């Protein structure tokens, strides 16, 4: 068993839970009640669900990798998931830093949850 992948999978599923519970309260509910036109509002709602699914599937994939460590495909899939979470974190950092907010790194702190998954997955793949 690969402990790094196990930790990454558990962390990713924790991130998914925070996204689903916190995101529903802090993002989805306000989005659905705002004055935005219905079509873009529903597209953003669907995108939120897509991210929820993606986070859960990534966590499950990492848990699976923790049990199958040593097979030839394990490293490639783990590096893909690590890159995936790095890209998510980078997207939040770029958006946050481009707005010009004071103390921007704490305004959208999602990157803080995403980077550990990437680091743990990369450590398991190395």
Residue ranges of predicted features:
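Juxtamembrane helix-break-helix junctions at the cytosolic face
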Residues: 59-79, 96-100
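Juxtamembrane boundary at the C-terminal end of a transmembrane helix
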Residues: 3, 64-68, 119-126
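Hydrophobic alpha-helical membrane segments
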Residues: 51, 78-92, 111-117
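Non-cytosolic membrane-interface motifs at loop->transmembrane helix junctions
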Residues: 2, 74-77, 100-112
């Amino acid at each position: 068993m690969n402990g790094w992948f196990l930790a990454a999978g558990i962390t990713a599923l924790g991130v998914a839970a925070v996204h689903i519970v916190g995101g529903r309260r802090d993002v989805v509910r306000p989005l659905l009640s705002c004055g935005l036109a219905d079509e873009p509002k529903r597209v953003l709602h669907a995108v939120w669900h897509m991210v929820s699914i993606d986070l859960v599937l990534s966590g499950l994939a990492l848990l699976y990798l923790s049990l199958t460590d040593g097979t030839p495909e394990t490293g490639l899939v783990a590096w893909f998931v690590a890159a995936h979470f790095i890209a998510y974190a980078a997207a939040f950092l770029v958006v946050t830093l481009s707005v010009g907010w004071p103390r921007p790194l704490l305004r959208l702190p999602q990157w803080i949850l995403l980077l550990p998954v990437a680091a743990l997955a990369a450590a398991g793949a190395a």
